[in-house]
């Protein structure tokens, strides 16, 4: 069957996945500090989204951040989720932007500021691509932290998640707090 023979609703899922792939390319080609590329990008769908949601719900009991419940429910409205993360690598500038005077004085586990900035620029490029193609997104720290817990982006010390959807109304805004996992 040709795509022109399909209803828009039938073709929408394929379109969203294609946009997500373009978002991944935009993240990859985004400028990087010192030209060093240590970001990782991945796409999850279907059962992986459910697994991510379940992990977010489980994390609430550990840390008490109730907004994880809302976000865990919210990502189930996504057709896919783009994950963008960075490995930890000192860039050797001794700039102090991370809070330490020198790179050698930086405590292990504290990301180099350039690593964090690179993730932010990659996220901006990915979301701009989605906006240009009229697809809805929202950057989620909560889902990114759960993806990091699942180790889906190997060795990444900071991960953000971007759920992606194309529907009549953006499901990622005007969200109501969710008090319990089953409500």
Region annotations inferred by a language model:
Residues 4-183:
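Acidic, surface-exposed loops and disordered segments
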């Amino acid at each position: 069957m040709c795509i022109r023979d399909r209803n828009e609703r039938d073709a929408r899922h394929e379109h969203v996945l294609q946009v997500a792939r373009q978002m991944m390319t935009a993240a990859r080609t985004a400028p990087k500090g010192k030209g060093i590329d240590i970001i990782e990008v991945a796409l999850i769908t279907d059962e992986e989204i459910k697994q991510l949601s379940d992990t977010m719900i489980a994390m609430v009991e550990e840390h008490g951040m109730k907004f994880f419940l809302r976000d865990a429910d919210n990502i189930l409205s996504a057709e896919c989720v783009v994950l963008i993360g960075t490995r930890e690598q000192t860039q050797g500038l001794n700039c102090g932007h991370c809070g330490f005077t020198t790179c050698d004085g930086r405590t292990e586990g504290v990301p180099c500021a350039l690593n964090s900035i690179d993730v932010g620029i990659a996220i901006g490029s990915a979301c701009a691509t989605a906006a240009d193609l009229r697809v809805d997104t929202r950057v989620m720290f909560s889902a990114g932290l759960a993806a990091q817990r699942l180790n889906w982006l190997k060795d990444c010390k900071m991960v953000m998640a971007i759920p992606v959807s194309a529907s009549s109304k953006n499901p990622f805004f005007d969200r109501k707090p969710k008090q319990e996992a089953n409500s």
